């Protein structure tokens, strides 16, 4: 079982967003809490955590087999990343029951409907969207998530899962966390499909930094992975000094961010210039042709 490693309490800066969150109900106000966390408090951390969450799902043989057979990662890894990012970001930024949120979920369901995916696999992917941001922030965020934020994250993705028609979603945070951990122990294992998808995803990330030596960049990516994930992809264990350096740099960043004033404007990923589309895209056009 992976345990959370809380950052020091001296990183707990006060912000108007945290004050607002502490006054909200994590069940009835979960849309607002997740929006504040994703777009104001932790935009960079949430993105990195969800990237790692998606990486973890590829270690599941049945998921990797579907993705590998589709050819999307081998030929269009960046487009696949941008499609996923824009759909999920729309749901978070607009809210799952807004017009755009409903369109995003409808498009996501249309894409998934082309493949034979087990309910348990859907449920694991959903659980990774809940727990990877929580784990990331506990290790590398400028503050860990408070209980209201953790419960709101669970409630938000619970509601998204219901709108995706995912069945048998655990009713509590603790039950979903237990499912997440038990599922990984039972299902993570090396396959050729997982290796191909993992390599394609790794190389996509490395392409973002063309001036960085590939060997060093790859080791930095491996340093963010635990042993079961490395084994599932057949990736080498990074040298201990590399892992220590990567973790130290992320903690240094956290301390620097903690000294900055709260963000004034939301960081909206749906407004950013994507590598695949620029800023010209429509929800209904995302996904495989």
Question: Where is each model-derived feature located?
Answer:
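Mature, function-bearing regions of proteins
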Residues: 1-289
